[in-house]
């Protein structure tokens, strides 16, 4: 057999797989289904080996499951709309569509060179009309259900990307895409009412037993459930009431002021007319502050007195109403009751503005005098509830307030509605028109898709580029036929990715986004693989859209992903791979040098796949040496003539035991989780064991039948990880079918039985000999064997005082 030439072998088998259609998944089968999905990429450039990691992981699982007799759905596509592709296109002065589709061609070629077993007949590209027609359809379904609405709102604005951002796309006050500090703009924007699903999104996390706990914790924290009470404060000399949400109703007797968020609609209504001019200056001043820093504990507290007072509903005391920078609309109702004795931010505000500080919880410990106390204690200065223990007494306080109509029990969430409007070109159009006569009108389903025009000046200006395109904008009203204008914003790309896993089931249907019977068969996804950075964005939005479609009757399941695996990153020189850092490792270069199978196996061998790993050139060289060594071993075995050796000598029994131990271990590691590194290690050990056998025996004593058994099972086991290598060897062994169509091998329990064991013989605790004994030997038989040993007898003088036997390990003779 010629030497290992990966480029020739891999090209040969990739053509074979494509010609035979081996990756194509039948829609219906008698086999159980298995939906294996990796998160699809943004095609904003070529792939590096960091991107490749999850594709290799997914393919190992898909190939293994096929061999375990599953009908495996393993599709691929491209998250082709959005800022990354658009910004890259702008930098290169090329149209986003041309840039994106060219990149898709490159990425597709890269992935095919890796031998990933995707069903390319199911490929989806979100920027094509055949896909975004149904993204628009989903928008209409939410609109019809009252879950899509438009309002003027203070939104996160990235001055570099020139577009609004959802809260989830802002990290530490900066745009997650370009790291630019985010500002605030007031714009008419479209929102999806994800807050209506906050409780279900939170509670149903408990159903996701196949998800990593840290991902569920991230979602729980983002949804941010708070249990407490809503309390109504009457505004003095007014019909107005201010509703406040608090998790500490037990501190109500300690309220000495009230604070409104600057963005609250109440501010203008409550402020005295003669103070409106000063108010406007204050609001403009606060508007220049970083809203995300405003919410931090260490921000300097600044306020403006509205001139009005509210009435404390339990004490009847007048409390001044302020507007303050440290209160945000994102929390509760945008109004906060100031309890300076028991909230540090309120304390700092009260000290600055000389407001009363009234203790109503007696601390259970000594505290500094210049700090608020927010721990447990006993209620004091609290009227009829004096002496109530906190926090146990909070429930009693709520009941007392409810009985008197002062408060009502409430659950609030930190989660805010999903802002989906983008003032950019490269996204799915929003299917809404505006008619002077009929107002806001949805585009009829039969008129979809609203096509994104090609000839557009798409450089970001802060205004939606489609606003300037009359050919796109000007249309007729679907209701009255009169002149109308299309909505000029496009949808957030996370809308596209919130349902793509459904489209893979019926990608060619142009009359429906998916067939219910088919998605109900294939979904939920059995195994989803992707980065943890999507825990709060894509994964949360996908769960929301799935629940909406379930409620509307389009799906029979309400969670999209049954099991989730989050892979670690691959670093180079201690940093995440990026072109700007010059530390990118190209998969094409690695494939040209070592072959795709070596690259695949090295990625899987780098360590536990959920952890980050450092790329090491010596590491891939080591895996390349292993594959060539395994190739040479298989070459020797394949060239041997068949024989019918039936009786196994001790050497054969040992090697056969090693083979079936490997089979059991590899199977357990594949079934028990993503332990690919230990799988590869087991395969390496098996090759070493085989070489130990053939190197220590003359060839005429080799048990050829055993070696052929080892070679066959080795090739089957390695095939999910090095599929081209396995196919070539399988063919050279004389098999006519693809190794992909073979069943996963089963280990032989009888081969694992150890007939003899070696035990240590000690005299007074010192090792004197090692002897082999039958595995079923009795203790007396073992003592007899030990006492007959020449190495032991020279240390024996008379009858032993004591003999200690540790079964199957050692015998200690004590004199």
Curated annotation (Swiss-Prot):
Residues noted as binding ATP in the record, renumbered to the chain: 579
**For the motif 'HIGH' region, what are the positions?**
41-51
**A GO biological-process term:** leucyl-tRNA aminoacylation
Q: Where, subcellularly, is it found?
A: Cytoplasm
EC number(s) of the enzyme?
6.1.1.4
Q: Where is this motif: 'KMSKS' region?
A: 576-580
MF terms in GO:
aminoacyl-tRNA deacylase activity; ATP binding; leucine-tRNA ligase activity
Which positions carry the signal peptide feature in this UniProt record? none
Keywords on this record? Aminoacyl-tRNA synthetase, ATP-binding, Cytoplasm, Ligase, Nucleotide-binding, Protein biosynthesis
Primary residence: cytoplasm
Q: Name the catalysed reactions.
A: tRNA(Leu) + L-leucine + ATP = L-leucyl-tRNA(Leu) + AMP + diphosphate
- GO cellular component annotations, sorted alphabetically? cytosol
Under the heading InterPro entries, the entry gives:
aa-tRNA-synth_I_CS (IPR001412), aa-tRNA-synth_Ia (IPR002300), Leu-tRNA-ligase (IPR002302), Leu_tRNA-synth_edit (IPR025709), M/V/L/I-tRNA-synth_anticd-bd (IPR013155), Methionyl/Leucyl_tRNA_Synth (IPR015413), Rossmann-like_a/b/a_fold (IPR014729), tRNAsynth_Ia_anticodon-bd (IPR009080)
Pfam families with a match to the protein in the record: Anticodon_1 (PF08264), tRNA-synt_1 (PF00133), tRNA-synt_1_2 (PF13603), tRNA-synt_1g (PF09334)
EC category name: ligase
Q: Which HAMAP family does the record cross-reference, listed alphabetically? A: Leu_tRNA_synth_B
Similarity field: Belongs to the class-I aminoacyl-tRNA synthetase family.
Name this polypeptide is given? Leucine--tRNA ligase
Tell me which species this is from.
Pseudothermotoga lettingae (strain ATCC BAA-301 / DSM 14385 / NBRC 107922 / TMO) (Thermotoga lettingae)
The root-end lineage is:
Bacteria, Thermotogati, Thermotogota, Thermotogae, Thermotogales
The gene is leuS
């Amino acid at each position: 057999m010629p030497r290992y030439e990966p480029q020739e072998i891999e090209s040969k088998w990739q053509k074979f797989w494509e010609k035979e259609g081996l990756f194509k998944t039948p829609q219906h089968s008698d086999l159980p289904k298995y939906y294996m999905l990796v998160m699809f990429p943004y095609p904003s450039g070529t792939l590096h080996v960091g991107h490749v990691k999850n594709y290799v992981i997914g393919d190992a699982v898909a190939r293994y499951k096929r061999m375990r007799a599953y009908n495996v759905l393993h599709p691929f596509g491209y998250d082709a709309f959005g800022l990354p592709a658009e910004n890259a296109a702008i930098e290169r002065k090329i149209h986003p569509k041309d840039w994106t589709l060219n990149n898709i061609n490159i990425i597709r070629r890269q992935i095919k060179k890796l031998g990933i077993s995707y069903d390319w007949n199911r490929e989806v590209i979100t920027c094509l009309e055949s896909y975004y027609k149904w993204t628009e359809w989903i928008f209409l379904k939410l609109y019809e259900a009252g879950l899509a609405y438009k309002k003027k709102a203070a939104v996160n604005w990235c001055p570099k990307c020139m577009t609004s951002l959802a809260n989830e796309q802002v990290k530490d006050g900066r745009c997650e895409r370009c790291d630019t500090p985010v500002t605030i703009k007031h714009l008419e924007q479209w929102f999806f009412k994800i807050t209506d699903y906050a409780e279900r999104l939170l509670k149903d996390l408990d159903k996701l037993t196949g998800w990593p706990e840290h991902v569920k914790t991230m979602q729980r924290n983002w949804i941010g459930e708070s249990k407490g009470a809503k309390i109504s404060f009457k505004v003095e000399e007014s019909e107005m009431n201010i509703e406040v949400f608090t998790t500490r109703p037990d501190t109500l007797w300690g309220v000495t002021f009230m604070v409104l968020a600057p963005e609250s609609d109440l501010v203008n209504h409550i402020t005295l007319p003669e103070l409106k001019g000063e108010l406007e200056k204050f609001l403009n001043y606060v508007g220049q502050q970083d809203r995300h820093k405003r919410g931090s504990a260490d921000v300097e507290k600044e306020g403006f007195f509205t001139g009005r007072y509210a009435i404390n509903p339990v004490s009847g005391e007048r409390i001044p109403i302020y507007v303050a920078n440290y209160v945000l609309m994102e929390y509760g109702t945008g109004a906060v009751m100031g309890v300076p004795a028991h909230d540090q931010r309120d304390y700092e505000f009260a000290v600055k503005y000389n407001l009363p500080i009234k203790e109503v919880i007696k601390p259970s410990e000594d505290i500094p005098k210049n700090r608020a106390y927010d721990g447990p204690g006993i209620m004091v200065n609290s009227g009829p509830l004096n002496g109530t223990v906190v926090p146990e007494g909070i429930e009693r306080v709520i009941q007392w307030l409810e009985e008197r109509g002062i408060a009502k029990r409430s659950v609030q969430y930190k989660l805010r509605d999903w802002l989906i409007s983008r003032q950019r070109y490269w996204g799915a159009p929003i299917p809404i028109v505006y008619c002077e006569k009929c107002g806001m009108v949805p585009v009829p389903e039969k008129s979809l898709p609203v096509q994104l025009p090609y000839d557009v000046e798409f450089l970001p200006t802060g205004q939606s580029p489609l606003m300037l395109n009359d050919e796109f904008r000007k249309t007729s009203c679907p209701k009255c036929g009169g002149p109308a204008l299309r909505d000029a914003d496009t949808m957030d790309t996370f809308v596209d990715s919130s349902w793509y896993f459904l489209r893979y089931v019926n990608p060619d249907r142009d009359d429906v986004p998916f067939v219910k019977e088919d998605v109900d068969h294939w979904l939920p996804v059995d195994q989803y693989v992707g980065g943890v950075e999507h825990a709060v964005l894509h994964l949360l939005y996908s769960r929301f859209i799935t629940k909406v479609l379930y409620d509307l009757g389009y799906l029979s399941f309400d969670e999209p992903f049954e099991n989730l695996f989050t892979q670690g990153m691959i670093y180079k020189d201690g940093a995440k791979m990026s072109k700007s850092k010059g530390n990118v490792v190209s998969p094409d270069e690695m494939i040209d040098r070592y072959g795709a199978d070596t690259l695949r196996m090295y990625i899987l061998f780098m360590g536990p796949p959920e952890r980050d790993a450092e790329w090491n050139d010596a590491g891939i060289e080591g895996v390349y040496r292993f594959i060539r060594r395994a190739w040479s071993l298989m070459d020797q075995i394949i060239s041997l003539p068949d024989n019918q050796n039936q009786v196994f000598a001790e050497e054969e029994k040992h090697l056969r035991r090693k083979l079936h131990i490997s089979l059991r271990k590899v199977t357990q590691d594949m079934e028990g989780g993503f332990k690919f590194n230990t799988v590869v290690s087991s395969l390496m050990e098996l090759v070493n064991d085989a070489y130990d056998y053939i190197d220590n025996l003359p060839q005429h004593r080799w048990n050829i039948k055993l070696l052929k058994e080892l070679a066959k099972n080795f090739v089957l086991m390695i095939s999910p990880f090095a599929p081209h290598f396995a196919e070539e060897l399988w063919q050279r062994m004389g098999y006519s079918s693809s190794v992909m169509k073979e069943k996963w091998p089963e280990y032989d329990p009888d081969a694992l039985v150890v007939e003899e064991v070696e035990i240590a013989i000690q005299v007074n605790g010192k090792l004197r000999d090692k002897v082999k004994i039958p595995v079923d030997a009795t203790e007396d038989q073992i003592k007899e064997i030990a006492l007959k040993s020449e190495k032991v007898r020279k240390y024996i003088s008379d009858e032993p005082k004591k003999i200690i036997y540790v079964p199957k390990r050692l015998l200690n003779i004590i004199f």
